[in-house]
Amino acid sequence: MKKNIENFKIFYSSPLGKVVSKIIAKKISQNWTTDSNLRIALIGFGSAYLDLVNRKAQSFFLLIPMLHGLYHFSLKKNNLTASVNEYNLPIDDLSLDRLLVIHSFEYLNDHKIFLRESWRALDKNGEIFIIVPHSFGLWRRYYKNNFFALRTFTIFELNSLLVNNFFTPISIDYSLFFPPNNNYFFKKASFFEKVGSRFFNFFAGVIIIKAKKNYSAAILKERNIIKRKTTRASRVDAI
């Protein structure tokens, strides 16, 4: 798994990778406001998107999963790069406004723990952006063979994971509507993106989903659990 970092570096320096980064950056920017004083973190591999998400940020954390290996990024001195355990993020409670997850979610073995950690780290109105390979997309095989992704996702699976872990999906987008192994197609990528986004989401290579932290849902669930435990205890005492 540690060779993933090198695979990503090689990919994003290639002509295909540069086309992909331009397309994905545009998709991110359509849903990523550049408000000042935001506390932002990116987990995974996102060197091609640092300038986009780091703009005007109050603080920025670049979190690289330990299994990806080590890689040095030149960031502003008030920012932090760290190799992390995705299930135990070195981030204080309620200390992030945005979390971008790219080249990370598809390598996790336990998405529930990761999403609960993300929920903990995000502020009450925090948002999470997740970019993952699509199970039915043209890039599914490329992600598995070249990036060694452990799995791909359908939009139903993503929605279920987010909702069950106290996030509310607020926008869904699709991208990469051209096959990755054909030079002719990726040279016409802008055309395929325009047509594909209108008519062929089923064949999109990646899903981009944005969700908001559902703070009240988690509090309500906790109260219900406590209430049920109290009720059971009362019944036992009565017996």
Locations of regions flagged by a protein language model:
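Class I SAM-dependent methyltransferase Rossmann-like catalytic core
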Residues: 1-34
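Class I SAM-dependent methyltransferase SAM/SAH-binding core
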Residues: 26, 34-88
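A short acidic, Gly/Pro-enriched loop at the edge of an enzyme's catalytic core
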Residues: 87-99
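A short glycine-rich, Lys/Arg-flanked "PGG" loop and its adjoining helix->strand segment in the class I
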Residues: 112-127
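Conserved class I S-adenosyl-L-methionine
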Residues: 127-152, 156
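Short alpha-helix
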Residues: 148-176
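Conserved catalytic loop of SAM-dependent methyltransferase domains
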Residues: 170-204
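C-terminal lobe and adjacent flexible extensions of AdoMet/dcAdoMet transferase-like proteins
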Residues: 193-239
